[in-house]
């Protein structure tokens, strides 16, 4: 019996080593990133980046009279971005876009949402909230 074990011991050790190496090569399960990316803060970060690029950096005339004022660090759990008058940033916001919860519940309100541009704002915000990058 000892002889049998001695003759197969190197094979068994090699097999164990191969199994351990194979297990180490397997991809580790990744945590679901979709739940994190659908939370309020990451959603509002995407919206702020999209709004800045498409509405302001591009020189879009529809947003020329406004300035973007992100308020993403919110202790209330409602990160938001504001559109304020360009020459009077301390004035009341003309548009508030905010999110809350996980998955994020979006809300957009203010005087600008009563103007013709409101449909475009709603479409853009939904696209960016869902991960779209375009304008």
Question: Which residues does each PLM region occupy?
Answer:
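Sec-dependent bacterial lipoprotein signal peptides
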Residues: 1-25
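Bacterial Sec signal peptide processing site at the extreme N-terminus
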Residues: 19-39
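Sequence contexts marking disulfide-bonded cysteines in secreted/extracellular proteins
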Residues: 26, 53-55, 134
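Extracytoplasmic/periplasmic, Sec-exported soluble proteins
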Residues: 35-46, 109, 113-117
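Post-signal-peptide N-terminal segment of Sec-exported extracytoplasmic proteins
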Residues: 41-81
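Mid-chain, structured segments of secreted extracytoplasmic proteins
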Residues: 77-112
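C-terminal partner/receptor-binding element of secreted or periplasmic proteins
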Residues: 105-106, 111-135
């Amino acid at each position: 019996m000892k002889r049998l074990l001695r003759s197969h011991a190197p094979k068994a050790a090699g097999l164990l080593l191969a199994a351990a190496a194979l297990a180490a090569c397997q991809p580790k399960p990744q945590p679901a990133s979709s739940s994190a990316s659908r939370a309020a803060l990451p959603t509002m970060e995407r919206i702020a980046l999209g709004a800045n690029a498409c509405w302001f950096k591009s020189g879009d005339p529809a947003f020329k009279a406004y300035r973007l004022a992100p308020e993403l660090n919110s202790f209330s759990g409602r990160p938001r971005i504001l559109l304020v008058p360009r020459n009077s940033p301390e004035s009341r916001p003309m548009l508030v876009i905010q999110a809350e919860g996980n998955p994020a519940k979006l809300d957009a309100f203010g005087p600008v949402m009563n103007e013709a541009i409101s449909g475009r704002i709603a479409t853009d915000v939904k696209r960016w909230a869902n991960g779209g990058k375009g304008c």
